[in-house]
Amino acid sequence: MRTLKSLVKIICTNVRYRNNIQGRGKIGLCSGDCLKIDRTAKLALKGNLHLNNDKDGNNGRSSILRMDANSTIECQNFSFTYGADVILFKNSKLVLGNSYLNSNCKIRCHNLITIGDGCVISHDFTVMDSDAHELDGSRNTNPVHIGNHVWIGTRVTILNGVTVGDGAVIAAGSVVTKDVAPNSLVGGVPAKMIKSKVEWKV
C-alpha cells in the first residue's frame, strides 16, 4: 500500500494541475516526487500516468517531471518505477502507450518521442530526440518512435531520429543511432543487427 503522505500528494497534485489534465486519467506518484508543469502544458490522460510505481515508498529515489510551455503528454496507461527523470521542453510532445519503464530512466523531449503499447523497458534507459547542443553550427533534433511490443535491455540509450520497429529487442548496454527493423535483435555501440525474425514473450 502507498503511504498516507503519498496518497495525500496524489490528491493534491491532481487538484493542483486539474486545468492541465484532460481525460479521465490521474497522475500517480510518491511523497518525494517533484513536478514542475507550466500552466500552458497539457496532459491528455486516457489512462493513468504512474511517475513512481513504488507503492511502499521505501526506495528513497524520487521521480521528476518537468513540462515547459505548450508541451504535451498523451498517455494511455503508463508506469515508471522510481527515479524517473522526464523533461519536456517548449512545444514538445511525449506519447506514452500502455507500457512499463523500469527505474532510473531519463527522457529528454525537444520535439516528439513516442513509446508504443506492450513495451518492456529495463532500468537506466535513456532516450533523447535532440543533440541538445550545437555542433559545427547545427543542432540535430528529430523524432524518436519506439513501436509496440519492444523489449529494451538495461542501460540502453536511444538517440534522435531513431525508429524502433514493432517486436524488436535491443540488447543491454546498446547505443542506438539508426533505425531498428521490426522483429530484429540489435546490440552494441553503435547498435547493429544480430538476428532477424525474432519473437519474444514476457
Predicted features and spans:
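Domain-scale signature associated with acetyltransferase and cell-envelope carbohydrate enzymes
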Residues: 1-126, 147-148, 166, 182, ...
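C-terminal segments of enzyme domains that contribute to small-molecule binding surfaces
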Residues: 139-161, 189-202
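Beta-rich strand-turn-strand
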Residues: 106-109, 156-169, 174-178
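ABC-type ATPase nucleotide-binding domain
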Residues: 122, 153, 171
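Conserved active-site beta-strand element of glycosyltransferases/polysaccharide synthases
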Residues: 186
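Short beta-strand-loop-alpha-helix junction that forms the active-site gateway
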Residues: 131
